[in-house]
């Protein structure tokens, strides 16, 4: 027997409509810029990736930091996680005007630090604009994505070595080039950038829908439980005799 038919019917209705909308969410009802059909989750993921890329362009600011260390030379030996990449890494560094010698499982590198970072930022700028051809040209024919990844790897290995050499400022600049320059460009390559200012109504609508949809399910379960006589009530405080 139902404890409250009205609450139970309301809960079932909410749960059915919740399920119908869930099915619609997983249907390819949306289309992206390239004409590809997307379901609701893919559409929102695509949108927020574009917005993330649009808010991750820091290259002009980082370039100013690199300018401050122009002429600063370094001489370190780094170990690479994959020693097989050492020859190609040495080629990339040579393009930047850095001396690189393959040594055991790593590289002995020296030169003007700003030149290496300038190449990393120039290539990252090309990738951020989805210009793989331009990035590849900077690496003299080596795939632009590969070249940037090699720079990121060797620069990551350099940070601790620079810190050991008391080149704290330089190590900080290298870290920022990797995190704010290379990583966004590499990770968001192929994704168009969107300005959130142009998408405020859509973003607000998606967030409002998310909150409403979550509450929708919660109320459905609550009303169904209430309808069958299962509800949460505050227990009475027992009075001592």
Feature annotation, model-predicted:
Residues 1-40, 207:
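Hydrophobic secretory-pathway targeting helix
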Residues 2-11, 197-241:
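Juxtamembrane interface at the cytosolic side of transmembrane helices
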Residues 16-22, 76, 100, 109, ...:
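Generic structural hydrophobic/aromatic packing signal, biased to beta-strands
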Residues 28-57, 194-197:
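Alpha-helical transmembrane signal-anchor/signal-peptide segments
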Residues 55-65:
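A glycine-rich, hydrophobic loop/mini-helix early in the fold
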Residues 63-173:
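Long, solvent-exposed extracytoplasmic domains/loops
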Residues 174-209:
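Short, aromatic-rich amphipathic segments at membrane interfaces
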